[in-house]
Design a protein with these regions (language model features):
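Glycine-rich phosphate-binding P-loop
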Residues: 157-178
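Flexible, gly/pro- and Lys/Arg-enriched active-site loops
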Residues: 45-52, 70, 74-78, 82-163, ...
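Nucleotide and nucleotide-moiety/phosphate-recognizing core
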Residues: 2-6, 12-87, 92, 101-104, ...
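Residue-level signal for short, function-critical loop segments
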Residues: 9-10, 163
Length: 250
């Protein structure tokens, strides 16, 4: 049996009852539910997401493999009325597989640990209640340690243009001046060469295409706090930075 961390979310009404139904279904399907957090009201991330969310976390013991468990979570979403019409849109129930023991996996459709979990306040606020000791193998930190890094007043985030974006005329002058969004300051990381900056995170922006996931880890993952964002244009990049700031600060 493998200890797994699951995130629950929803914002179309009745989320509390759907969370309970999902937990009961997972327990009945052969996974053993060890702990469930309180429900937290959180801000929606992105204009398409709709109104505020209810979020929670659960710890399971599962005899299934990671792909089997992912398919089981998606089946429970469907039973609870989830319709996948709009990516990042409003939803009745969202079940995300965050951690599968200390497994690391990088495949189309399943990346473990979840690439964006470590900077999302709406994920960690509930996860720390039930899984503070669970380990993020890529960052080499516990959930409790990741949560503590969100409990600061200001966040400096370095932004790098990667691949063709670095040479793109569309992105000429992009983020020449730091972008302040609430408590989060986004700065081009190249501007800080030779300057010691205690980055909360680094974002690597790459050109999006239809094959891309929304986020990923860099190929050569150095163990630092780096996230790849796939963007379509400077305007889309700025929107994703604003969404990232909302995810960090809640």
């Amino acid at each position: 049996m493998v200890r797994c961390l699951i995130a629950l979310g929803g914002n179309l009404g009745g989320s509390e009852l759907l969370f309970q139904r999902a937990i009961e279904q997972l327990d009945a399907d052969g996974d053993r539910v060890l702990a469930v957090s309180r429900n937290f009201e959180t801000r929606a991330v992105g204009e398409q997401a709709g109104g505020g969310f209810l979020n929670a976390a659960a710890v399971l013991e599962s005899a299934a493999g990671p792909w089997q468990l992912l398919q089981r979570l998606q089946a429970v979403e469907s039973v609870c009325g989830r319709e996948r019409m709009l990516r990042w849109g409003p939803r009745t129930l969202d079940l995300d597989l965050l951690l599968f023991g200390e497994s690391e996996q990088w495949e189309s459709g399943l990346i473990l640990p979840h690439p964006a979990m470590w900077l999302r306040r709406f994920v960690l606020s509930s996860a720390v209640e039930v899984a503070g000791d669970m380990w993020h193998p890529r960052l080499g930190q516990s959930i409790d340690q990741l949560w503590q890094q969100l409990c600061v007043p200001q966040f400096a985030v370095g932004v790098e243009l990667s691949g063709e974006l670095a040479e793109s005329a569309d992105f000429a002058g992009f983020l020449e001046q730091p972008l302040q969004h609430g408590a989060v300051s986004f700065q081009r990381s190249v501007a800080a060469v030779g300057v010691a900056v205690n980055w909360f995170a680094r974002l690597q922006l790459r050109r999006a295409d239809l094959r891309n996931p929304p986020w990923s880890y860099p190929e050569a993952y150095p163990g630092d706090r780096t996230l790849v964002l796939f963007v379509r244009s400077p305007e889309n990049a700025l929107e994703q930075l604003r969404q990232t700031a909302t995810a960090i600060t809640g």
